[in-house]
Amino acid sequence: GKNGYGIYDVTEDSIKVCTQNIGEPKKEWAAFPLKGELFDHNAKANEYPDYSVNKQYGVKVKWCVKGEGGIYSSPFKEDNRLFVGDDTGKLTAYNIKNGKRLWQFSAQRRIVGDCAAENGIVVFGSADSTVYGVSSANGKMIWKLKTQGPVLGAVRIVNGLAYIGASDNKMRCIDTKTGKEVWEYSGVTGYIVTRPLVTDGKVIFGAWDNTLYALDASNGSEVWK
């Protein structure tokens, strides 16, 4: 299938539903007038959320923690701790066994991309145009690196080097101990939001410019695209 988005155009008298595939014109496939009543008075409201499927399969909750905002990123595990960012810009560490909050670090804006940790340092990006390195033990900031655009990409750490893309159309390699940039590649013409693959001496990633890139992991030079 093709990658794209659903778009709802709301006007004073109607709602139009469109599909926008990447690289193609927007296509309208449904429209509804905003006149009269668009609901059934006799209909029974659905209970939400519906947990009945848990009874069917015997699922039991080990622990559940209510956050302060939407969680769009995947958690990352190091030892008995897991780390996850949220829409309020907070990176939180939890005890995996019981869900107890261990510490919390606040960035200036939302955290969308997946974090990663190695050797006691958690690395993640934020929409405040910053890449952070914080202690996995207590959440204290060790370093930060400013960028020229929101950092919504996921992090990959290999042998003390963090690879992360950003919305300034750059892929970066950062020393996780010092926060210093080892190299950056600026040949991208679209946002980078994925977690790069590091294999066979290459950093491989895709971007919103419909392109897959392979860079030399040691110096960031382009191998192919």
Predicted regions and their residues:
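Extracytoplasmic/lumenal domain signature
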Residues: 39-71, 76-152, 156-193, 197-225
